[in-house]
Amino acid sequence: MIKIAIKIPKYKFRNSCYWFYILKNCVFSFLLFIYTNPAHAQFPEGFSATGNFDEQEISVTDTSGKVSILINAPTNLDHKRKTFLIFYALPNGNTIEWTKGKKTQPGDDWHFNIQHIAAQTRYVRHLDKKNNYILVYLMAAQKSWPAWKRNTPDSLHIIKKMVDSITALFASLSPKIILNGHSGGGSFIFGFLDAVEKIPANIERIAFLDSDYGYEEKHKTKIIQWLKQSKKNKLLVLAYNDSVVIYNGKPLVSPTGGTWYRSRLMQRNLSEAFAFTSDADTAFITHEALKGQIKIILKKNPGGLIYHTEQVERNGFILSLFSGTKFNNKKYFTYFGDRVYEHWIKD
């Protein structure tokens, strides 16, 4: 049994439960019980059907109010399928509802129309019916993971415990984990990497959606070792040339602080262990290695424009889940093309 605090009714299961561990420094306000028979696992009662797109959700808040979590899952979870548990760390300045997205009406906040993570997830589920996709939205109270880490004692330990505890809730599904994030959300991913001696075997994909500001050379060894562990492990990095952007009369980022610089540094570091092929056209520079296990896509920016969230909106989140798979095909979607998920946007 896992003791975690969430402000919802107790979950009930038909078989006996067991104590697993107590989530230190990030205790939620309710009890969740892990069903111990995988063959007959039930989904927790605390989830509520959304009434849209055959989904169910549960909102979770830690007792100190520092992290808000929303877990979204399909109602037709099949325990015979492979399950991907996606941890999506929110970008700076965004709420969970903005990040999910919806069809906007006059007067709506513009943030509702710039990511559409919910609709992109629905498109992924529609396209890949052989796998389960459970999505975990993670929002820091400051709406900034870098600020949260700076102001939270033992932040690395808390990040790891959050990932471990939420993963344990779905133990009967033996999920594979995807660490994903946009903008400052990359700080959450690096927080997890810094918290572990070795990237765990259940991490099957890491995606930085213009979010690798925090990359340092110290991370390369762990990433290289993880990529060598399994051909199933995949790394995707999306970035644009933010080094040429002038905003309000000043450079948007420092010469070494943007994702353009950090992504190229990561590619150079990884090239010490892996042979890359590089292609360029008028729009992108693409670096690949290990037959698509590693893909780093850098958008050129001759006009000095801001493409920060557009990389996510224009099918970037879909790419983050499908890169290196049979679904990474133009007949299904094009990165930086038209939004293929319009039909899946909630009213």
Regions from the PLM with identified roles:
Residues 99-108, 130-153:
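Cap/lid segment of the alpha/beta-hydrolase catalytic domain
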Residues 142, 146-170:
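Alpha/beta-hydrolase active-site loop
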Residues 171-183:
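Alpha/beta-hydrolase fold nucleophile elbow
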Residues 181-192:
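Glycine-rich nucleophile elbow surrounding the catalytic serine of serine-hydrolase chemistry
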Residues 197-286:
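The feature captures the conserved acid-bearing segment of alpha/beta-hydrolase catalytic domains
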Residues 249-347:
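C-terminal accessory extensions appended to soluble enzyme cores
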